[in-house]
């Protein structure tokens, strides 16, 4: 539901990301599972325009790994205005349930509140978003705000958009997703579409350009980098697509970085700019087909070396009973000595069975040689009432170093019930 997910700016300033709950950091800095004891989520409509949502989760303490028990809450209100626009308020709270000697004062709690306005014109030409968020921690600080804006206009031939965001150095959202703090980012985008006359195969051609400029005002090197992405796209009448793309990147490393994540390897040195260009070719067949394919090839420079990637997704379905897909991603990273080179594989099949209108079974399997992990997630769903479901979820994870060794295993029962008042 957008009540719990549609906040901030995707990838750069997301104050709430539900999958952060249940994940913690141990004493060695490793990311590990933090068991969830209980939780609930409520959402509903007060009237035709006003909706509210409340989510609360309690996680288990793990003193051996220096992890306290936390209570995490999100409360949100979203109200529709004008033809299609809306505004929203939210409050996020992550707080220790008791005092712990091993928890630093500034980590005892984290609170974020915010306001957002989402613009959508009646004719669909104008869209946009503006937001302002503020975080609160036990330590007083001045640069604890985050705000941003995006405004877009879309016509038959032109699509133009301009966005910008700021996240303060002291802003924190423990339940959110932020790749960095203390930055300013600008993201202009333009697309021009050509509709050929009397074509029996092509819907339109599109020329587009996207740029991203990132600044770090309080760093010694205040310019972090830029991306310039130019592409040519063809959309066919049968819903297949073809695209050619050029990516020109310039990144500054503030910290040593190993893009291969090879244990014990020498990372790329920090305090340097890396400029590189790569190219991408992508093609996808219509999803409506019995068998469909999405394929992408990327090749070119990568930091001070080269990279070759192939991403494939194969889908097969027999409606309405069965649907399966297979993702195969391969990355070959070649860096000059003494830096590491590596071939990285990600293989992920998915199976979906529909037994009847009320019972469904979905299974995900994922293997990657980068983290040497094999994961299985299997979910049985029973829709016992309108918008109400009972889930039985099985999770299994294995290390694949030499031999397959179990990492952790869990069985969860989840109930979703719609109360119509």
What do these predicted regions represent?
Residues 1-199, 409-411:
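Outer-membrane beta-barrel channel domains
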Residues 35-37, 43, 123-421:
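Exposed, low-structure sequence patches enriched in small/polar residues
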